[in-house]
């Protein structure tokens, strides 16, 4: 296990551990993956995120060798493995069901892969115990899987996968069977383990919060195509289109019309009947239809009198107290419902808005993301 921990990242820098080139895959005549290209770097925690049926698990299964690509090439650590069977790829998979052998002890479950590889008997025990120490379950070595909690079973499945010293560890929605509190705990532990091992993790999930909290990099997929590739912050704060924006967290989408360009970075636009200045450095003409995107936490609401008209206005129709935040729904005169999330401060007399209260909606200039009609989907 020490070999894994001492991977020389400098030697491998700049060279992907996995390269998918022009990959396509169809089932029963329906294309699931179309001309997909993806590089995965050494020591990276990459998450493939997308709705059910987007092709993310198919990509994982093709990397593992459980599915064969119809077209394209899969390269693993400079070796073309497109036609190499799963058992000869230096890749291990942790499944959603964990797939532990119920009749075997924890020790034997973890040792199974080593024995299948005909590892010398003298090496097996120290390697298994080292793997169990990494997941803090060395004292459970002689127990059976049914004697363990869900979180412990998950850690055993990971220990069984990493004991073989894979170049890449694949995780297929492997936290989804856990309850919320345990899932949050395992997210932290999984990221810590990945840093400790220094090997590449490729994690598949449909849970946006999970992806944002664990990943170095996120691939957002839809219908077999990569919609966006970037860091968690880029994906959340700079979505490339409305699909990504709406899939990753809550977002408000205001329809806007460009009026004029102010300078290289800013334009004047009409948003909900109100002239506003927004940041948009791409080409646009007066009259172009745009969308202005703002997260609920980026918006501010100011209580105003019924007689006042102050920018974009509406009335509070819902309030939800969530401990740290107070979430409000504001209905504009146009009928649009706007979500606003404010940090709750019990000493602030203005934060707990009354239902029916008239409010003005504002935000810090440049916090918005502006898309044109071509980026709508």
UniProtKB/Swiss-Prot annotation:
What keywords does the record list, in alphabetical order? ATP-binding, Cell inner membrane, Cell membrane, Membrane, Nucleotide-binding, Translocase, Transport
**One Pfam family of this chain:** ABC_tran
Of the GO CC terms on this record, one is:
ATP-binding cassette (ABC) transporter complex
Any GO MF annotation of the entry: ATP hydrolysis activity
Question: Which reaction equation describes what this protein catalyses?
Answer: ATP + H2O + polyamine-[polyamine-binding protein]Side 1 = ADP + phosphate + polyamineSide 2 + [polyamine-binding protein]Side 1
Domain named ABC transporter is located at 18-248
The record, for InterPro entries, names: AAA+_ATPase (IPR003593), ABC_SmlMolc_Importer (IPR050093), ABC_transporter-like_ATP-bd (IPR003439), ABC_transporter-like_CS (IPR017871), Mo/tungstate-bd_C_term_dom (IPR008995), P-loop_NTPase (IPR027417), PotA-like (IPR005893), PotA_ATP-bd (IPR017879)
Q: EC top class, in one word?
A: translocase
Main subcellular location:
membrane
EC number, as in UniProt: 7.6.2.11
Q: How does it sit in the membrane?
A: Peripheral membrane protein
Per UniProt, where does ATP bind? 50-57
What is stated as this protein's family in its record? Answer: Belongs to the ABC transporter superfamily. Spermidine/putrescine importer (TC 3.A.1.11.1) family.
| NCBIfam families, alphabetized | potA, PRK09452.1
Sum up the protein's function in the record's words: Part of the ABC transporter complex PotABCD involved in spermidine/putrescine import. Responsible for energy coupling to the transport system.
Assembly notes:
The complex is composed of two ATP-binding proteins (PotA), two transmembrane proteins (PotB and PotC) and a solute-binding protein (PotD).
Q: What is this protein called?
A: Spermidine/putrescine import ATP-binding protein PotA
Q: Which organism is it from?
A: Vibrio parahaemolyticus serotype O3:K6 (strain RIMD 2210633)
